[in-house]
Amino acid sequence: MTQFASPVLHSLLDTDAYKLHMQQAVFHHYYDVQVAAEFRCRGDDLLGIYADAIREQVDAMQHLRLQEDEFQWLSGLPFFKPDYLNWLREFRYNPAQVCVTNDNGKLNIRLTGPWREVIMWEVPLLAVISELVHHYRSPNAGVDQALDALESKLVDFTALTANLDMSRFHLMDFGTRRRFSREVQQAIVKRLQQESWFVGTSNYDLARRLALTPMGTQAHEWFQAHQQISPDLATSQRAALAAWLNEYPDQLGIALTDCITMDAFLRDFGIEFASRYQGLRHDSGDPVAWGEKAIAHYEKLGIDPLTKTLVFSDNLDLPKAVELYRHFASRVQLSFGIGTRLTCDIPQVKPLNIVIKLVECNGKPVAKLSDSPGKTICHDKAFVRALRKAFDLPQVRKAS
């Protein structure tokens, strides 16, 4: 296979906002914590043939660094501290932390090292894999086809919402990790900027260059790592929620609910957390059932749901977002994060269902037991059983 002509990535900020938000919290609170993370392809794609090309891109990433204009822009945001930004200025990717192999056609990737550094690999590395694969599989597809597909979707969207009050509909681009390419994501976001309901992007590079609001708080790994950082497994989720508020007392307050199922999350999400966090993010399971549980929980605590925001981000497209908006708009604030269905929705192109997830923290297992059993990730079945017991989970979920 011929090698990709040039580096896929051009900016250290070409990543999701929550990576930097979490990295700052790790820098301040868990500087010496060590982790391991692994790549998973949830589909049947045999991606091992791209291992050498991916390795070449990983090696090229060591040359990325925070540029002065990027540093100044980050310094103007309200939640970053000078000590972290000065450290980030000196940060360089370390390719030695990444092991890429072709295992009889299956792509294996394992990341190891200090959490404060490893945390940065996931999103850009997935974006690299996605762009490389689509470059070889669909060499004739690109920006024009992506924009044509988007225009068709926007025509349908306009018809679908003709009789709706859309003043409280807020859409965000969450499409970095599985985008067709960097150029396609930028073109899609620039087109969506023309719509009044488009409010921002999770991509820090695009947010800076297009003067958009960067969107994101924390990911599953924040909660997973606390399973080993916290001295008591049963209180690890509460420890993660409290540590986040310690770093961000009154900002970035959308909590992810499905690291250990929504029901287990709500048992930990008492009046103090529910009052201080601005809202919740859905990332697995039935979205309507999840939203109803969230609203009922706020009401039970005496909190007006209209003062809180629910963010839906699981496998969304525009029609699904409208359906959820119709259901919930009068009862709670809403935002919708759409990823693959915006940045890799091109006819004849099959998006990759790929993830990189934490599997160890300080040499011990961690797990994600989401509201969609197929999204469960953990090597250690005994740890999964211990986690289920600690959080009183009612059903067995297969560890994959």
UniProtKB/Swiss-Prot annotation:
Example of a GO MF term: nicotinate phosphoribosyltransferase activity
SUPFAM superfamilies: Nicotinate/Quinolinate PRTase C-terminal domain-like (SSF51690), Nicotinate/Quinolinate PRTase N-terminal domain-like (SSF54675)
InterPro entries: N/Namide_PRibTrfase (IPR041525), NAPRTase_N (IPR040727), Nic_PRibTrfase (IPR006406), Nic_PRibTrfase-Fam (IPR007229), Nicotinate_pribotase-like_C (IPR036068)
Transmembrane segments annotated in the record for this chain: none
Keyword Transferase attributed: no
Family: Belongs to the NAPRTase family.
Protein known as: Nicotinate phosphoribosyltransferase
The organism of origin for this protein: Salmonella dublin (strain CT_02021853)
